[in-house]
Regions:
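Envelope-exposed proteins and targeting segments
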Residues: 36, 81, 97-99, 187-189, ...
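Oligomerization/assembly interface segments of phage tail-like spikes and tubes
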Residues: 30-50, 96-108, 229, 282-295, ...
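Charged- and aromatic-enriched interaction segments used to assemble
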Residues: 94-220
């Protein structure tokens, strides 16, 4: 059982109150190179009584409002999730009125921001920070994110793009060969890593045993071994490239994809992006998810990006799930007492390279 606090924060970055005791059906998640997520329900009458006692009774939206207030979650005294409120939902019945709260991590703010990028021979972590800093300097655009630290090696890159959405720019730069991971922490620091997380040979989960349940698909539905990259421009004037993998074509036939990057003006950048798509989509896809319960895994001791040992026993079709996998996402359901059900999703793409980078830290 963990001790949780669900803190509402003001737009001027001040804590306003803890509402965990009101939360029902709470769920939070963290995903590598993506936004945190948080959702929960409250009984509207209890909620309004509570904030009235705090001095917010005349206008409930003065305490918590969509788009304005942040919610930060503490677990055992440590901040684990930082989000901005995106949506309230209201549902009434004969017994009660419930308000659902949905909040998403700070990275999703940059889904609504666009910049023009011109960088030459620049460290990729500086390029990433540069687009956020550009957003900060626009009128009404300073979301409070500040630069944190970089861990690991540095790679120099060129980037020239027009009116590019910032979130996808950061994610695409993380996916190219030798791209770096990134995160925005609950206190709004932008950190970059050669490879986020730690190599954890001491941590091992098996089914049956520590793993309560698991699921995964093995699919070629989204496989592509020929990728046509289309950049800025119209028709034949557009910047274009093609990359392919003959080994994959021989194994599972030719499978094509068009990847559009309308803001990309340089062929080198376009080829890097198309090659990244090919790398991650040329083979049948498996992303094992496991669920652990009743404290079988200490969330204080594991995080997104960590590499741990996973083994599924009992059936020949599962025997290949036996080795080191990297945690891509952590999703946690929390009851009113702090009991948790934890779901981890993994992949093993480039796992030996990831381990070597994590061991070097």
């Amino acid at each position: 059982m963990a001790k949780y606090e669900v803190e509402v924060w003001s737009k001027d970055n001040k804590p306003m109150g803890d509402i965990f005791h009101l939360c029902e059906n709470m769920r939070w998640s963290k995903t590598r190179n993506d936004a945190d997520m948080l959702s929960f329900d409250v009984d509207l009458t209890r909620y309004e009584e509570y904030i009235k006692a705090m001095g917010f009774g005349d206008n409930p939206k003065s305490f918590m409002e969509v788009g304005r207030n942040d919610i930060r979650v503490k677990r055992n005294g440590r901040y684990i999730v930082g989000t901005n409120i995106i949506k309230f939902g209201y549902k009434g019945s004969s017994s009660a009125v419930k308000m659902s709260v949905n909040a998403s991590g700070y990275l999703n703010y940059y889904k609504k921001r666009y910049v023009t990028v011109n960088y030459s021979n620049k460290p990729q972590q500086d390029i990433m920070w540069g687009v956020i800093d550009t957003c900060n300097k626009m009128a009404g655009g300073d979301y409070g994110v500040r630069r944190g630290r970089h861990t690991g090696a540095t790679v120099l890159r060129d980037r020239n793009q027009e009116r590019k959405e910032v979130k996808s720019f950061l994610q695409q730069l993380s996916q190219v060969s030798k791209g770096c991971d990134f995160e925005i922490t609950p206190d709004k620091l932008f950190n970059t890593y050669e490879a986020q997380g730690y190599y954890r040979p001491d941590m091992r989960l098996e089914y049956p045993g520590d793993i309560a349940s698991f699921s995964f698909d093995r699919s070629v539905e989204n496989v592509a071994n020929v990728v046509y990259g289309i950049g800025s421009g119209n028709g034949e004037d557009a910047v274009q490239t093609k990359v392919e993998d003959a080994t994959s074509q021989q194994a599972i036939y030719r499978r094509e994809m068009i990847a559009s990057y309308n803001s990309v003006t340089e062929i080198g950048t376009l080829t890097q992006n198309a090659t990244a798509v090919l790398h991650y989509s040329k083979d049948p896809i498996e992303l094992p998810s496991i669920t652990v319960e009743n404290g079988a895994l200490d969330l204080s001791d594991v995080g997104v990006g960590d590499t741990i040992y996973i083994k599924l026993n009992g059936n020949k079709s599962l025997q290949h799930i036996d080795g080191y996998y990297r945690i891509e996402s952590i999703s946690v359901s929390v009851d009113n007492n702090g009991w948790e059900s934890v779901e981890l999703t993994f992949d093993d793409i480039d796992i030996n390279d990831i381990i070597s980078k994590q061991e070097a830290v």
